[in-house]
């Protein structure tokens, strides 16, 4: 494990988030010959999936709400791996992450985040992204929330020379007040991928 690699990964994630913020700031500026009111009307009329995604990322970025991420487990699917591979892999990653989040008018969760952790080969893996979950809040269970959604993320791995790799993934979470267990499944082929990655989120 290399502390220098982890620090570099965190800096890489921060720089990427900074670039996203700069792009979003430019995206929110109306043309010089268009009034703010006219621009708002045009945004609503011409809204599409990409524009909604950018708007949700921007709103999450501007939110004062913050989250801490702590990786807990990377479980490799025993039905898709040889035993010797399983024995050689790290399934107790250590790392840390930071995010900004908001709940919209429907109580659905939106967040932008950056995280760095030790991967299956004990090499540093950074990841940044946007996450969305549709939340279910049981009326009879005060403080509990259950979520299903997705993350649109970018990661980079040691064996691929830290070239940025797009990584859309599903998300599931169980939450109680400010604490959450969140997980995703990374699909793959035999002896590659097929990992259940779980982490803790703490909102502050």
From Swiss-Prot:
GO cellular-component term (any): cell outer membrane
Classification via InterPro entries: LipidA_acyl_PagP, OMP/PagP_b-brl
HAMAP family according to UniProt: PagP_transferase
Organism: Yersinia enterocolitica serotype O:8 / biotype 1B (strain NCTC 13174 / 8081)
GO biological process: lipid A biosynthetic process
Active site: 76, 119-120
Enzyme class: transferase
Keywords: Acyltransferase, Cell outer membrane, Membrane, Signal, Transferase
Signal peptide: 1-25
Reactions catalysed according to its record: a lipid A + a 1,2-diacyl-sn-glycero-3-phosphocholine = a hepta-acyl lipid A + a 2-acyl-sn-glycero-3-phosphocholine; a lipid IVA + a 1,2-diacyl-sn-glycero-3-phosphocholine = a lipid IVB + a 2-acyl-sn-glycero-3-phosphocholine; a lipid IIA + a 1,2-diacyl-sn-glycero-3-phosphocholine = a lipid IIB + a 2-acyl-sn-glycero-3-phosphocholine
Record keyword Kinase present: no
Induction field: Induced during magnesium-deficient conditions.
Upper lineage: Bacteria, Pseudomonadati, Pseudomonadota, Gammaproteobacteria, Enterobacterales
Presence of keyword Transcription: no
Record EC number: 2.3.1.251
Residues marked Role in the phospholipid gating (site): 190
GO MF, one example: O-palmitoyltransferase activity
Pfam (any one): PagP
Subcellular location: Cell outer membrane
Descriptive protein name: Lipid A acyltransferase PagP
